[in-house]
Amino acid sequence: MGKALMVQGTSSGAGKSLLVMALCRIFSNLGYDVVPFKSQNMSLNSAPSIEGGEISRAQYLQAVACRKKPSVRFNPILLKPEGNMRSQVVFMGKPIGSVSAREYMLSRKEELFRKAMKVLDELMVEHEIVIIEGAGSPVEINLKDYDIANMRVARHAKAKTILVTDIDRGGSFASIVGTMELLSKEERNLILGFVFNKFRGDASLLEPGFEYLEKRYGKPTLGVVPCIEHKLPEEDSLTSFPKVNGELHIQIVKLPHISNFTDFEPLHWANGVDYVTKAEEIEGDLIIIPGSKNTVEDLLWMRENGIEDAIIQAHHEGSFVVGICGGFQMLGEKIIDNVESKRGEVKGIGLLPAKTIFTPVKRTNHLKAEILWEPAKRMSVEGYEIRMGRSTSERPFSIIREINGAKAFEPEGALGERTFGTYLHGIFHNFAFTERLLNFLRAEKGLEPISVGGWSIEEEIERFARVVEKNLDVGYIISELGLG
C-alpha cells in the first residue's frame, strides 16, 4: 500500500496546486513512483486525459510533474461553472449533467465521493506515493459538513497533511491558528506541519511565530517558500495577467463564461495582453474571442453590450480577429444550439465562413495539425480540443494530422479576411506559430521582428521544484511518511 501526502491551505490561492506540483517533481526526481490526486476540483480550465476525458489543468500539470500521462483518475470530479449558480458535473472525464449548487450538495455529492475514494484506494495500491491536493479552506463553517475535498479525504487516506498559507497576503499566522482551532482533534493529528508560501524578506523574522505554533500545536514549520517568478499555468486567476501595453495592442474579450484562458499565457509573456469588457475599449491590433462554457449566451452578451459591433468595426479598420473554440464558433455565420443554451439557431458574428451545430457528445482529444493560414502555411502545431460543437467551413484553418497519436486527415477551423478561428486550445504554446503571427502583425506596423519562447513547461516545473526543495524540509517529510 502506498503512502498519502496531502496539501491543504488556509484559503483559496494559498499555493496548493503549485506546491503539489513541486512535490510531485521532487519525489519523482528522487526515484519514487508518485501520482497526484484531487477528489473534486471546480475550474473553467480543463485539459484532455489519456482516456479521452477531461481533467482540471492543475492535475494535468501535476501529472506532467510526476512524469505520468494525465488520467481522469487524478481528478475524478470536475465542476465547470456555467453561470446562474449552476455547474456541469464531469465524473471520470465525462459530463454527467448540470446541477445547481444545492442540488449537487443534496443529491449527487455523496455518491460521487464514494466513487472518488474507490479511485484513490486503487491509486494507493498501484503507486508508492499519492500526493493529494485539497480545495479552498478545510474549515469553512458553512461548507465543512459538505466538504469532500479536504479532511474527509485526509481521514480516508490517513494522509500526512501539510497546511500551507500565503504569507504575501498578510495574516498568515492568524490564518493557521484559526484553521487549527476549527479542526477536530482527529484532524489536527493528521497535520504534519506548516508551510509559509510566497514570502518576501528575511525569514528569520518569522521565528517567534514558528516557536508559537510548535509550542501550541506540537507541529513544526516545514518551510518558507519565497515568491517564485514563473511561467506556469495559473488555474483560475485572470488577475495573474494584469493589463500590459506591449508594442502590439492585443485584446482578449473577457466573456462572462470565459474558459481555458491559460491559452493566452504565451501572448502575455511575449507582448502583454489586455482583457476587455466594454465596446468602447475594442481597438486592438489583435482581438481574440476566447473559449466559453456557454457560447451562445456569451455571444448574445457581446451583442447586447455592443461588443460584437465594435469588433466588426475594428476588423473593418484593420484589426486582426481570432477565435479559439467557442470564440471560433461565435465568429461564424450561425450556431445551432439545442444542447448548451437550447436557443436553437442563432446568428453568428459573420467574420468567418463557418457554421456550427452543437451535439451532446463532447470531443476531448490531443491533436497535431498542419496550418493552412498563409503566413504559417505547412507549419506543424499541437494542442487539444474540448468541445461539443461540430463546425464546417470551405476554408479551414488547419488540417488535423493526428488525433491522440493516431493518423488522421480532418479539416479544422476556418479562415477569413484578416480572421481565423480554431478549436486548437494551446495553439499559442507553439512558440514558432506565435512568433510568426506576432511578427506578421509587427511588420504591418513597421516594427522589428521578435523571438518568442526560450522556455518550456518542463523547464519551468523543474526550476520551480528546485526552489521549493531548497526551502522545504523534504527529509522530514520522507521520514514521517515512513519512506526513509
Curated annotation (Swiss-Prot):
* Pfam families referenced in this protein's UniProt entry, alphabetically: CbiA, GATase_3
* InterPro entries assigned: Class_I_gatase-like (IPR029062), CobQ/CobB/MinD/ParA_Nub-bd_dom (IPR002586), CobQ_GATase1 (IPR033949), CobQ_N (IPR047045), CobQ_synth (IPR004459), GATase_3 (IPR011698), P-loop_NTPase (IPR027417)
| Catalytic residues (positions) | 325 (nucleophile), 425
- Keyword Cell membrane on this protein? no
Biological process (GO) annotations?
cobalamin biosynthetic process
What protein does this entry describe? Probable cobyric acid synthase
| One annotated GO molecular function | catalytic activity
- Which key words are in the record? Cobalamin biosynthesis, Glutamine amidotransferase
Q: In which pathway does it act?
A: Cofactor biosynthesis; adenosylcobalamin biosynthesis
Q: Which family does it belong to?
A: Belongs to the CobB/CobQ family. CobQ subfamily.
Q: What does this protein do?
A: Catalyzes amidations at positions B, D, E, and G on adenosylcobyrinic A,C-diamide. NH(2) groups are provided by glutamine, and one molecule of ATP is hydrogenolyzed for each amidation.
- Which segments constitute the GATase cobBQ-type domain? 247-433
Q: Which organism is it from?
A: Thermococcus onnurineus (strain NA1)
Q: Which CDD domains does this UniProt record tie to the protein?
A: CobQ_N (cd05389), GATase1_CobQ (cd01750)
Checking PANTHER family in the record gives: COBYRIC ACID SYNTHASE (PTHR21343:SF1), DETHIOBIOTIN SYNTHETASE (PTHR21343)
State whether keyword ATP-binding applies. no
